UniProtKB/Swiss-Prot annotation:
This is Interleukin-7. GO terms for molecular function: cytokine activity; growth factor activity; interleukin-7 receptor binding. Its main location: secreted. It is found in: Secreted. The lineage of its organism: Eukaryota, Metazoa, Chordata, Craniata, Vertebrata. The gene is IL7. The keyword Secreted applies. Belongs to the IL-7/IL-9 family. GO terms for cellular component: extracellular space. It comes from Ovis aries. Glycans are attached at N94, N115, N140. Hematopoietic cytokine that plays an essential role in the development, expansion, and survival of naive and memory T-cells and B-cells thereby regulating the number of mature lymphocytes and maintaining lymphoid homeostasis. Mechanistically, exerts its biological effects through a receptor composed of IL7RA subunit and the cytokine receptor common subunit gamma/CSF2RG.
Length: 176
């Protein structure tokens, strides 16, 4: 009996076959000199950082988003693309116009500099879920405040990671 497996025919370890699509990126960096980042995005990121009241226990809670998405080698563009799209969700919050302006600048500026092509996947609209029982007014207020604090913690961490990722990319570009 003649037993030949796929990996021996083509000489490719199976791990590479699994990791190959993840490492490839459909983004092209524009503004490779870093000027647009330094002069526009960095300023808005710093302004947003200063606007957010930082709570010391924010850093102890790492959200699942960062466990699933990180700025690892060859994944920088993918991380920044997801992070910029995540920033857009914060525009729906009840925040000041100045805050929205900086948030929009960072989100749109990042997406513009990355120049990513969309994959055209259709998204399923979020379900409304089951009706929740109403709670008393005090509980609702405290839950809203807690949620807002968690959102601001997440935003603060996200901005720091975006900044770190951009710096990593620009260091890599200047070295080559």
């Amino acid at each position: 009996m003649f037993h030949v497996s796929f990996r021996y025919i083509f000489g490719i370890p199976p791990l590479i076959l699994v990791l190959l699509p993840v490492a490839s990126s459909d983004c092209d960096f524009s503004g490779k000199d870093g000027g647009a980042y330094q002069n526009v995005l960095m300023v808005s990121i710093d302004d947003l950082d200063n606007m957010i009241n930082f709570d010391s226990n924010c850093l102890n809670n790492e959200p699942n988003f960062f466990k699933k998405h990180s700025c690892d080698d060859n994944k920088e563009a993918s991380f920044l693309n997801r992070a910029a799209r995540k920033l857009k969700q914060f525009l729906k919050m009840n925040i000041s116009d100045d805050f929205k302006l900086h948030l929009s600048t960072v989100s749109q500026g990042t997406l513009t500099l990355l120049n990513c092509t969309s994959k055209g996947k259709g998204r399923k609209p979020p379900s409304l879920g089951e009706a929740q029982p109403t709670k008393n007014l005090e509980e609702n207020k405290s839950l809203k405040e807690q949620r807002k604090q968690n959102d601001l913690c997440f935003l603060k961490i996200l901005l720091q990671k975006i900044k770190t990722c951009w710096n990593k990319i620009l260091r890599g570009i200047t070295e080559h």
